[in-house]
Amino acid sequence: MLKITIITLGNKMPDWVNSGVNEYAKRFHDGIQIKLIEIPLLRRNKSSDLARILEKESALTKDALPANARLIALDMLGKSFSSEELALRLTQLQQISSHLCFIIGGPEGLSNEILTLCDERWSLSKLTLPHPLVRIILLESLYRAWSIINNHPYHK
């Protein structure tokens, strides 16, 4: 069984986000287990020391990392994939690890410490995406790749 953990920094999401996440998570059948770990954002204001906040959020993220998982940072500068390329990459990764962990940063992104810990960096888009949508786009992209791998009609 493939385990997918998504660690995300963010505050309580609106119902439509949770509905989207739940919809894609339940579409994966018995072969894939999805787990979402939400780390609350630290308070920010105009006088906040963003470097210090990033350092603290980095420590919280590090504490949440599952042991023996392949760590994949979502980062604008990461590698981007077509749906078919992503399906191929997932097939390759399943032979390397049975646990993939995707990390979604906060408004300032991920710290260099977290990026260095990661085995890979992927980009969903060159656009800056709102954090609520990133969760849904990631799960939809993974589901689409899964449907390609399994010849499921969803992709076409």
UniProtKB/Swiss-Prot annotation:
GO cellular component labels: cytoplasm
Localization terms from the record: Cytoplasm
Keyword Nucleotide-binding tagged: no
Annotated catalysed reactions: pseudouridine(1915) in 23S rRNA + S-adenosyl-L-methionine = N(3)-methylpseudouridine(1915) in 23S rRNA + S-adenosyl-L-homocysteine + H(+)
Entry's family note: Belongs to the RNA methyltransferase RlmH family.
Assembly and oligomerization: Homodimer.
Protein name, UniProt field: Ribosomal RNA large subunit methyltransferase H
Organism: Legionella pneumophila subsp. pneumophila (strain Philadelphia 1 / ATCC 33152 / DSM 7513)
